[in-house]
Regions:
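Mature catalytic core of soluble alpha/beta enzymes
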Residues: 2-10, 16-351
Length: 351
């Protein structure tokens, strides 16, 4: 070899070795969890992100930043849609106080109106007077008689309210709104969008059972969500015998087996039929709806509990982007499960 070339080649090799040996290994994603109580229920969030040092170097939020961001989302929604916060926008609207509506209220209202129209009124946020009358809100009292429930029906109906110039207009001042069947789904979506906007695309958000799974885990596995098996008692331990795999999809479960009151030996379920003014009666114990967003899944889970299984299945034929797992009682009183065909490949049984 030409000695004049050997020395430069050796130096280049030495420099390359030095660069490789001194370069820092790429920071790896780590698993983080957030848990707490909010909106009268729990939240559980799992996400994959860099540790604080690596996140700061990459100009990404730290764990404290993420917690503060999520807390601010909960706070903004509570100040807008809470029935238990007397100073919320919703409380003021229900009290007929002239109030300028913010975008959170308008977005939820518009979504609710869209699903009311889509379900022919089976989903309806104007059922608040009936929910209060049956004692499912923060007020207690004897259950309404058939005549009393009928008298409240005149104030129920999504076509009796509208937004104009950022203010709510009611046909009757007695009409009140309840966003509980859609607000938690909306909250779940907001948190997921917040995480994704900060490059945290592998995460799962659960707000009171309204779940959204974003992307896959770093190892390539899909997120797995358990579906609760209905029980005969409110206080019975939760049991799960079914898992569903999700990716960029939401699942929301609605059921009456834990949400009811008993008066004079009569069980009143919390799902109110907006058309009759009475609790829904059918064989359906619970329904778990999958949808592109938690807002959609939340609204439809409630609507399906009003419809019953047969009508819900007919709805899904027309709208295949929505699928469901139904748990119901057959004619012999046995608990059965029926799964939409499109979901069967995603279902696992827990032994």
């Amino acid at each position: 070899m030409n000695k004049s070339l050997a020395k430069p080649i050796f130096l280049l090799f030495a420099i390359a070795v030095l660069i490789v040996s001194c370069s820092k290994p790429e920071a790896k994603l780590q698993k983080f969890t957030l848990d707490g109580r909010v909106q009268g229920t729990y939240y559980h969030i799992v996400y994959y992100h860099f540790d604080d040092k690596a996140a700061t170097q990459k100009n990404l939020p730290t764990q404290t930043d993420i917690q503060h961001g999520i807390d601010s989302i909960f706070k903004a929604i509570d100040e807008t849609l809470s029935l238990w916060n007397p100073n919320s926008i919703l409380s003021k609207v229900n009290d007929n106080k002239e109030t300028l509506l913010n975008q959170i209220f308008i977005d939820n209202f518009n979504s609710a109106m869209a699903f009311s129209a889509l379900t022919d009124g089976d989903f309806d946020i104007t059922v608040a007077p009936l929910i209060k009358a049956y004692g499912f809100a923060n007020e207690k009292g004897s259950k309404p008689t058939g005549r009393q429930a009928d008298s409240l029906l005149q104030y129920i109906g999504y076509k009796k309210v509208q937004i104009k110039d950022r203010k709510l207009e009611k046909q009757y001042p007695q009409t009140q709104l309840d966003f509980n069947a859609i607000a938690q789904g909306y909250t779940t979506d907001c948190i997921s969008k917040y995480l994704s906007a900060h490059s945290i695309t592998s995460h799962i958000v659960d707000v009171g059972g309204e779940v959204y799974a974003s992307g896959k885990k770093p190892d390539g596995q899909q997120w797995r969500v358990a579906i609760e098996q209905p029980s005969d008692s409110i206080d019975a331990p939760r049991q799960y015998n079914t898992l569903i795999r999700l990716e960029n999809q939401s699942i929301v479960t609605s059921g009456n087996y834990r949400k009811y009151t008993i008066e004079n030996g009569i069980k009143y379920t919390h799902t109110i039929n907006p058309h009759t003014g009475k609790p829904a009666k059918h064989s359906l114990l619970s329904v778990s709806v999958t949808a592109p967003t938690s807002t959609e899944a939340d609204a439809l889970a409630t609507a399906f509990m009003v419809m019953g299984m047969e009508k819900a299945e007919q709805f899904m034929v027309k709208h295949p982007e929505y699928q469901a797992v139904f748990i119901y009682c057959d004619e012999d009183g046995k608990t059965k499960t029926k799964i939409s065909e499109a979901l069967k490949s995603k279902i696992e049984t827990i032994e």
